[in-house]
């Protein structure tokens, strides 16, 4: 009974976050898998990574960041979302182009009518296929003549969703850009890797529900602006102002180019979510973990693995493991 109560709270949370569509016969609204903060390193910083570059997780946050990613990179992640639901992500990127797939499954939830009596067992499933690209001076040579480091990106999203016996699908398009600035020296220290980003989300697109698309709901255009900078060549600060007024603050400290420690806060209205994370970089193989707290639900634990084949060095990785393992 306690588990069913928790799952009903999860569905209530899904219904409250974003009005993605009105489900026929249910009269509720559900969120999209795209509204859950993706990735693992990004989640550890509460999603304040929209201006970071050269990372396969740029696929999820700002495709323009893919422009500086060379070679082949693979990423995968899994989380027990809110302690009950399953959230899984996969991504692959090659020389600025990327494909991704996100899956959310609430599990079985006991449905109830207006009087509170049990009706049927329902489940909410939502998947999204992503195709993204990032173009910078490596791909567009004329950008090298600009006084700033400019890159542009785009993303095509295909979404499928089902709630009980009702299903739907749709697509949307995003465009984004990033600008990097020269280092700034202030007294005895310098600020490096200063970047700003802007993602224009869901420029057009809609979800269609029912056998004959009786119900249609547009995604609704929104913006996500971001800023990040590095201090002392090891400490990264990130700030994102996201859709529906969300504020993301994050920090990452890297020790010996091996261990990354992350923390962040996400604010929406008067609701605050806190995150922490840790990452281990083993010469091309990254292992990441993130924890996200929730006010009335169990914490989300997410783990992921990223492989950068261009940096993969099994010999160096073996040496690192020998130093850190007993």
Descriptions of predicted regions:
Residues 1-2, 150:
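Helix-centric, low-specificity signal for extended rod-like, repetitive segments
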Residues 2-12:
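Bacterial N-terminal signal peptides that target proteins for export
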Residues 12-22:
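Bacterial N-terminal signal peptides
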Residues 25-326:
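Subset of outer-membrane beta-barrel
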């Amino acid at each position: 009974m306690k588990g069913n109560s928790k799952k009903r709270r999860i569905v209530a949370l899904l219904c409250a976050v974003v009005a993605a569509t009105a489900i026929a016969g249910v009269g509720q609204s559900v969120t999209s898998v795209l509204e859950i903060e993706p990735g693992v390193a990004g989640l550890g910083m509460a999603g304040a990574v929209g201006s970071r570059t050269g990372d396969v997780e740029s696929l999820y946050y700002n495709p323009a960041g893919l422009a500086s990613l060379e070679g082949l990179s693979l990423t995968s992640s899994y989380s027990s979302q809110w302690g009950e639901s399953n959230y899984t992500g996969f991504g692959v990127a090659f020389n600025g182009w990327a494909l991704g797939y996100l899956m959310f499954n609430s599990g079985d939830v006991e449905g109830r009518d207006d009087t509170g009596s049990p009706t049927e067992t329902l489940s909410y499933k939502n998947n999204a296929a992503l195709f993204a690209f990032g173009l910078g001076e490596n791909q567009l040579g004329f950008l090298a003549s600009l006084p700033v480091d400019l890159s542009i990106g785009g993303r095509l999203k295909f979404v499928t969703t089902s709630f009980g016996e009702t299903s739907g699908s749709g697509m949307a398009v995003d465009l984004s850009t990033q600008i990097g600035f020269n280092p700034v020296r202030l007294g005895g220290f310098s600020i490096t890797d200063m970047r700003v980003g802007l993602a224009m989300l869901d420029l057009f697109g809609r979800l269609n529900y029912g056998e004959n698309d009786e119900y249609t709901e547009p995604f609704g255009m929104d913006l996500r602006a971001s800023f990040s900078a590095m201090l002392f060549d090891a400490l990264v600060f990130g700030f994102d102002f996201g859709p529906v007024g969300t504020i993301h603050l994050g920090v990452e400290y890297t020790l010996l180019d091996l261990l990354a420690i992350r923390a962040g806060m996400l604010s929406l209205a008067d609701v605050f979510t806190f995150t922490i994370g840790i990452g281990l970089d083993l010469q091309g193989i990254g292992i990441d973990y993130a924890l996200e707290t929730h006010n009335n639900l169990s914490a989300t634990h997410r783990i992921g693995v990223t492989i950068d084949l261009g940096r993969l060095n099994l010999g160096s990785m073996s040496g690192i493991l020998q130093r850190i393992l007993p």
